[in-house]
């Protein structure tokens, strides 16, 4: 076994939480149960990592075996990476061909290796998802296994979830995906998160959809609250019910997908109607700013704003539309009115 492969395997083992080490090694499947029983899990973790490398050397592990371990690690801890959603499309209406995994892998490798031979490509299926691992190299350097790109493709959908993709490699990977999946074009969606499953919930519409209602106010029956102590006056009962009703109508009642960030880029012209007149920004350049919202669970935080009394109900569509528009990055510009001094926000 090459020394650099041994070092790569060792680094993966060192990244594993101590309690998860044996679980990951069993899922890897390269070492037998009897071989795993010889391992002694103890601190420092370097001792365990060295023992794993020794077993791998005895079995002459290859880069494909090391890549398989990297697959298992990144699948189990996918939330350690930032994932971006890409969407593919076809120029003309046509029936989707039956997915042939072998043909997909062949065409994918062929497309990339036609441009660069010094690239290692591996595939692994996890349920309905096909995971692709690409380690990029140059003419003078071997593929960098420590900065591999991962792409997760669901064959029955036009969506691909990608992480670790540099700008220089993006055109080549996108071209390979389009060719192998028999689509015409691909584009990046304005949707990112560390929670891969939540991104899937959003683009596949798997999360709890809010109900639609033609009533702007809740039913009277919903306003009746059991009064435990008749001496207590529930002054805000009706308003609280209205807020909760609008919140349920906007976000639903089930769990929401997990996103950590939403950003809004604003471009607008400041204008004055006083004697100074004209634009307040020099050179007719628009004023630009970026507003970012962050939270460990942003959508749940937004849903709780109105019930907590922090914001008025209903919540602005700029915030509530995130899961339905499948994006958490927006650019807001102004609509040009008939009069120079008039402007208003535009839809996004």
UniProtKB/Swiss-Prot annotation:
Signal peptide: none
Record's keyword terms, sorted: Centromere, Chromosome, Nucleus
A Pfam family reported for this protein in Swiss-Prot or TrEMBL: CENP-N
Disulfide bonds: none
Keyword Nucleus set for record: yes
GO-annotated biological processes: CENP-A containing chromatin assembly; chromosome segregation
Superkingdom per UniProt: Eukaryota
Cell location: Nucleus; Chromosome, Centromere
Name of the protein: Centromere protein N
Organism: Xenopus tropicalis (Western clawed frog)
Lineage of producing organism: Eukaryota, Metazoa, Chordata, Craniata, Vertebrata
């Amino acid at each position: 076994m090459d020394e650099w492969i041994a070092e790569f395997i060792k680094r993966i083992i060192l990244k594993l939480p101590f309690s998860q080490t044996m679980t990951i090694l069993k899922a890897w499947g390269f070492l037998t149960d009897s071989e795993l029983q010889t391992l002694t899990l103890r601190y420092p973790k370097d001792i365990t990592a060295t023992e794993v490398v020794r077993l791998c050397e005895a079995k002459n592990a290859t880069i494909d075996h090391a890549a398989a371990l990297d697959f298992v690690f990144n699948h189990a801890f996918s939330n350690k990476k930032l994932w971006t959603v890409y969407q593919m499309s076809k120029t003309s209406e046509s029936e989707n061909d039956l997915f042939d995994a072998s043909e997909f892998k062949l065409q994918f490798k062929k497309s990339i290796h036609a441009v660069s031979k010094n690239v290692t490509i591996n595939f692994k299926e996890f349920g309905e998802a096909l995971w692709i691992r690409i380690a990029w190299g140059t003419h003078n350097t071997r593929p960098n296994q420590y900065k591999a790109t991962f792409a997760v493709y669901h064959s029955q959908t036009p969506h691909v979830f990608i992480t670790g993709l540099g700008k220089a490699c993006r055109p080549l990977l996108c071209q390979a995906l389009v060719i192998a999946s028999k689509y015409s074009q691909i584009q990046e969606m304005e949707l990112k998160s560390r929670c891969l499953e939540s991104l899937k919930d959003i683009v596949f519409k798997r999360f709890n959809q809010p109900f639609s209602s033609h009533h702007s106010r809740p039913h009277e029956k919903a306003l009746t609250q059991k009064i435990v102590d008749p001496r207590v006056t529930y002054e805000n009962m009706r308003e609280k019910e209205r807020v909760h009703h609008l919140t349920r109508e906007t976000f639903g009642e089930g769990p929401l997908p997990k996103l950590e960030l939403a950003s809004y880029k604003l471009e607008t012209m400041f204008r004055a109607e006083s004697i100074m007149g004209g634009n307040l920004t020099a050179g007719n350049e628009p004023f630009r700013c970026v507003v970012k919202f962050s939270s460990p669970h942003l959508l749940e935080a937004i849903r709780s704003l109105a019930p907590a009394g922090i914001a008025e109900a209903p919540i602005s569509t700029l915030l509530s539309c995130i899961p339905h528009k499948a994006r958490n990055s927006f650019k807001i510009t102004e609509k040009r009115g008939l009069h120079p001094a008039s402007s208003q926000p535009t839809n996004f």
